[in-house]
C-alpha cells in the first residue's frame, strides 16, 4: 500500500470510527499531541473511538501533502472536522501532521500532531480596490 493510500485509509477509519482499522494503521508506540497540547497514546486514541467519547462526523480533506522515502514518510493534511467529543459538538479546521514508519511493507503512524489551521487567504488579499 502506498503512503497516500495508507493516509486515505486512516481518514476513512477515523470517519467510520473503525477501531480495528485504526489499530492496524497505528504503530504500537504511536504518540499524538492534540490541538490543546494534550498528549495521547495509541491506546488512548483507540479507546476514545471505542467508547464513543470521540465520534468524528465529518473529516473533509482540503489539502494533503505526502512525502516518503524507503522507510519513513510524512503526511500533512488540512481538513474541516466536525465531531462529538465528550458529548459536545465541536468543529474546527485542523492540520494533521503525521510521521509514518514502513514496517513489513505497510505504513504505520508513529507520531501525530493536530493543530488549528490558519484560515485560507481571501482571494482579494493584495488586490487593488
Tell me the role of every PLM-derived stretch.
Residues 1-23, 31-129:
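A beta-strand edge to alpha-helix "cap/lid" segment located at domain peripheries
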Residues 27:
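ATP/adenylate-binding site constellation spanning eukaryotic-like Ser/Thr protein kinases
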Amino acid at each position: 500500500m502506498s503512503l497516500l493510500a495508507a493516509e486515505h485509509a486512516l481518514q476513512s477509519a477515523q470517519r467510520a470510527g473503525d477501531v480495528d482499522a485504526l489499530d492496524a494503521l497505528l504503530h504500537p508506540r504511536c504518540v499524538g499531541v492534540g490541538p490543546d497540547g494534550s498528549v495521547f497514546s495509541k491506546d488512548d486514541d483507540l479507546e476514545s473511538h471505542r467508547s464513543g467519547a470521540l465520534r468524528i462526523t465529518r473529516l473533509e480533506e482540503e489539502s494533503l501533502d505526502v512525502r516518503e522515502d524507503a522507510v519513513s514518510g510524512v503526511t500533512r493534511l488540512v481538513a474541516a472536522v466536525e465531531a462529538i467529543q465528550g458529548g459536545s459538538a465541536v468543529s474546527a479546521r485542523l492540520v494533521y501532521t503525521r510521521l509514518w514508519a514502513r514496517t513489513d511493507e505497510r505504513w504505520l503512524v508513529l507520531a501525530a500532531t493536530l493543530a488549528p489551521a490558519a484560515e485560507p487567504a481571501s482571494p482579494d488579499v493584495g488586490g487593488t480596490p
